[in-house]
Amino acid sequence: IGAVISAAGVLYARDKLDNILHVELDESSLAADNDISDYRNIVILGVDTRDMSNFSGSRTDSIIIVSINKTSGDIKLISVYRDSFLDIEGVGLDKVTHAFAYGGPERTINTLNRNLDLNITEFAALNFKTVAKVVDSVGGIDIDIKDDEISQMNTYLPETARYLKSDFEYITEA
């Protein structure tokens, strides 16, 4: 059920939020495995940029493949470790996070398809601000922290609030 909720959130965000990059991809450059017809695979890319209009030099901090079984409707989320060494076309072995810096979403999808035998032709790229909007749109997320984590959490609150243009309150108890 968690996968269904996650996928629904991603699709809602993809349609409703303005901080998600929409790009037409050159499908001939994606190296999609056309023999895979029973699954629709979409990649969600969490990028390390604050400016969604300029991805130059950005990397992916998070790579999640949403795999939808077309027959059963089952949805699986697969996280690809950002530091996995994969063969990046024209570069050689490198961390998959760097594929985005070398060629944006097309190079990243090409790398995933060629190395993992997938058929990805769709993606959503989100930055931190977009993730915050998605979380807000579902009413927030409760997290449990320990007393010894409060100080560290409070260190990041002012900068995060400034970036999101929002108010914050320091955490006083776990």
Which residues does each predicted region cover?
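Second-shell loop/turn segments in exported
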Residues: D51-N54, D94-Y102, L116-E122
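Generic structural marker for isolated residues within well-ordered, non-membrane alpha-helices
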Residues: I109, N113, V131-A132
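Short secondary-structure boundary/capping elements
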Residues: V10, G103-G104
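Solvent-exposed coil/turn segments that connect beta secondary-structure elements
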Residues: V47-R50, I68-G73, V80-F85, A101, ...
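Flexible, polar/acidic helix-loop-strand segments at domain edges
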Residues: D136-A174
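Flexible, solvent-exposed short loops/turns enriched in glycine
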Residues: K76-G103, D147, P158-R162
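Extracytoplasmic
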Residues: S37-R40, S58-I63, S72-V80, V91, ...
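Entry/capping segment at the start of metal-dependent catalytic domains
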Residues: I1-G73
